[in-house]
Amino acid sequence: MNRHLGKLGEEFVVRLERHRLLLAGRDDLARKVLWVAVEIGDGLGFDVLSFDDQDESEKLIEVKTTGLGKFFPFYVTINEVRCSEDMAEQFHLFRVFDFGRTPRAYILTGSLKENCHLEPTLFRATI
């Protein structure tokens, strides 16, 4: 996994969300968008805290970035899966692709278990 590319993708989504809220006339909410992965730290199950411009509800955004195509596989942590389950109505996965060329994105809303085929690829071993 390329951490630098991931951080660039997160920054892209922070700017995108602020811009979306400004266009909706919600300067107040745009100022509240928080890059939690940087400001608070990893481990919350999402990277960006944003808001719905209509009802002001929180949007918990996990960002997955690739320089490759739309369907290139991505990795998620158990914490991200749990967050998507526990906070399904607020959880959004932004899949940023073609980053470095013309970045584009699609959004999956709700449970990752319901939106994706999840395949275990890492196991913890104890003796």
Map each language-model feature to its residues.
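Acidic-basic catalytic patches of nuclease active cores, encompassing PD-(D/E)XK
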Residues: M1-K32
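Extended, charge-rich C-terminal regions with high alpha-helical propensity
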Residues: L44-F46, E56-I61, R124-I127
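Conserved catalytic cores of phosphodiester-cleaving nucleases, focusing on short active-site segments
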Residues: V13, E17, V48-S50, K59-G67
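Catalytic cores of nucleic-acid endonucleases
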Residues: H4, E56, V63-S111
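Protein C-terminal end segments and domain termini
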Residues: P103-I127
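A short acidic/basic microdomain associated with nuclease active sites
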Residues: R20-F51
